Structures are given as structure tokens and as C-alpha cells.
Amino acid sequence: MKVYSIEELHNLIVNQEIDLNEYYYDLFKEVEFQQNRLNAFVTITKTQAMDNIKELKISDEEILKGIPGVFKDNYNTKGIKTTASSKMLEDYVPVYDAAVVEKLYNEGVSLIGKSSMDELAMGVLTNP
């Protein structure tokens, strides 16, 4: 799958040089392939992302509209499991979005999944 910068993908979408549905279809094929190799996602949000892009009206000024995004699994995402890779949060489904998630959604970012992380973001530090 070809990789684009945000600006490149935005321009392709706005100029109708790429079909957003086909792009996301190919993107999720790649996500599923890489998930089997790397186990990089805690949650994959294919249905939500595909539903989201159906409703989008993209203009030249809205640079993030239609752009796929991945959030670490410690950011609250309303209605989508948020575990922070912790057993004690394995069933937690937030009733609100984190402020940064809300801002990115308002800009038109389409969530494709929640990425794995060290439990509760408490990984080993290597700073001196």
C-alpha cells in the first residue's frame, strides 16, 4: 500500500484523484495484515471509520477531514473500549471523548484503531 503524507492524501481526496472508500478498504486490509504480524492494535474501528467517511464533505480548507488516525489506548474514545492495555480496564468503555480526541474528530479525522502500549503508559524509562 502506498504511504502518503497528510497533505498529499488531502490533496488527492480534494482533487478526486483517490476514492476514499477504496483507500480505506485497502488501508484496513493492510491494518489486518500488520495486526497479525505485530499485534499493534488493541481495537480496530473499521465499522466506525467506514461509516464516518460516508458522511464527509471535504473542502480544500479542511486539511484533516478524511485523514485516518490512530490513538493510543489511553485516550478516552466515547463508546469505544479504552483499556490502557490494563487487565483492570479491559471492559471500560468511556462515555466521553478526551479533549484531544474531540478536537481531532471535529477536524474530521477518522479513527481506524486504538494502538497497543505499555500498561497504563508506565513503560520503562531509558532517560539518564
Named regions from a protein language model:
Residues 1-128:
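Gly/Ser-rich catalytic/binding loops embedded in alpha/beta enzyme cores
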